[in-house]
Amino acid sequence: MNTKELIAAEIAKVVPELEQENIQNLLEIPKNADMGDLAFPAFSLAKVLRKAPQMIAADIAEKIDASNFEKVEAVGPYINIFLDKSKISADVLGQVIAQGSHYADQNIGNGRNIAFDMSSPNIAKPFSIGHLRSTVIADALANIVAKQGYKPVRINHLGDWGKQFGMLIVAYKKWGSEEAVKANPINELLQLYVRINAEAEEDPSVDEEAREWFRKLEAGDEEATALWQWFRDESLVEFNRLYDELGVSFDSYNGEAFYNDKMDEVVDILTKKGLLQESQGAQVVNLEKYGIEHPALIKKSDGATLYITRDLAAALYRKRTYDFAKAIYVVGNEQSAHFKQLKAVLKEMGYNWSDDMTHVAFGLVTKNGKKLSTRKGNVILLEPTIAEAVNRAQAQIEAKNPNLPNKEAIAHAVGVGAIKFYDLKTDRMNGYDFDLDAMVSFEGETGPYVQYAHARIQSILRKADFTPSADATYSLNDVESWEIIKLLQDFPRIINRASDNFEPSIVAKFAISLAQAFNKYYAHTRILDESPERDSRLALCYATATVLKEALRLLGVEAPDEM
């Protein structure tokens, strides 16, 4: 029970007219610390109790059980509550020390599955910064729900099917060289893709030729299938190397092609339920009753299936395979209309579990304010970006700590962590402008800043040769340590807020606040000086490092012990 819950519970005993949750929502943090740690305004009770707010405040202050608090006093219409800092700090530090990285673990999920549709790069195209957002947001959310007791299922829904393969086959047959592709597969395939798109803008017949090759691929043509498989295999080797660098793994790589033989069932169900209508030769599902203006296009007039048909097949397969409690689609904001249609069609098919599906959208990454585009060759590739971030991290580590052992491994953790953290600290619906200098900086609200705070604490603990005892009681009541204690106590609530809002930035911002609070404490407090509080101060350091490391782990970022 956190302090707000504790206060609300005590006030509710005195004022049964208000729900405990309402009381909790009304609690305020006074602007002046002399007015207490939290305050409850009595205005909302005036009408119900037919008394002046000042009298109500005085009544509550007199009747409330103050044994859990330092003191409770009425000031005008407010009940000001002063928390017992020594008692709370002892409780919080005791919990963190006893539970370690399991502090804030919960069993809300009770082992149920949550399926994450994530990353989903396109085969034969390089992995760009644009794909990073889906990958790291979903991976962080998967870690967060695992901490709540759910079992995340990470599904990489590869973009391994579609007209773009027709384009690529046309380009390869026109200009491609097997040796060039084998020597540098992704880069060579990208050049071919950009070149054929430029030609298609000038010559509409290229589009028709690409469509024809894709139709052959759908029909199982031997040459088309062999080229497609080769492009896919080469791309996956490259992608997996990058996923290893990012520290991200998947439970399934079933992409679009996996559902080729599973779409007929979708069309059959829609037909049997009388949901398909003809529109200009195409087969559609009308969704006007859901407030969706455009019908869902299931089959084109030439008989080709569409993206939504494939996603319907995928949803059915995943429900049967994983029996998910929730299915989370971490996909860009521009796909929001598609996911509204997807859920509505499933609802029409009679699958009420579609209510458990959520599109977790996110904003775009730009460069100098401009949208990135693989087709136009305006793209920031992830592999060279990681290499540059690691180099910059290593240069800063060399300057700060030239004799540090394992410099390369630590630079990798800092460089990769910097890129991931910068993405995750941004509210996901906001885009951000790519700025490697800002990402890798050790100052400001960055991953390296948080990692450095953790490494600094580990250095203090090594100097002191301190390991907390599970039997000891550690308590503090000074202002600087209290700021840290409040944050540590809030960590379980942070986890739940991040999960409820599908918002990893809540955890990232918490980590920044905790690092800032510790750095302020470090500047004001002589931690290692001999004094009665020394062990409690070191216990605070230990607890802070534990929670910082766990917050970073949830974000998929390493916390080196030295930097």
Curated annotation (Swiss-Prot):
GO cellular component, as recorded: cytoplasm
SMART domains, alphabetized: Arg_tRNA_synt_N, DALR_1
Main location group: cytoplasm
Enzyme Commission number(s) from the entry: 6.1.1.19
CDD domains on file: Anticodon_Ia_Arg, ArgRS_core
Pfam families to which the protein is assigned, alphabetical: Arg_tRNA_synt_N, DALR_1, tRNA-synt_1d
Localization, UniProt: Cytoplasm
Domain of life according to the entry: Bacteria
Keywords recorded for this protein, A-Z: Aminoacyl-tRNA synthetase, ATP-binding, Cytoplasm, Ligase, Nucleotide-binding, Protein biosynthesis
Placement of sequence motif 'HIGH' region: 121-131
Any GO molecular function: arginine-tRNA ligase activity
Annotated GO biological process: arginyl-tRNA aminoacylation
Reaction catalysis annotation: tRNA(Arg) + L-arginine + ATP = L-arginyl-tRNA(Arg) + AMP + diphosphate
Family: Belongs to the class-I aminoacyl-tRNA synthetase family.
Subunit organization: Monomer.
Record protein name field: Arginine--tRNA ligase
Organism: Streptococcus thermophilus (strain ATCC BAA-250 / LMG 18311)
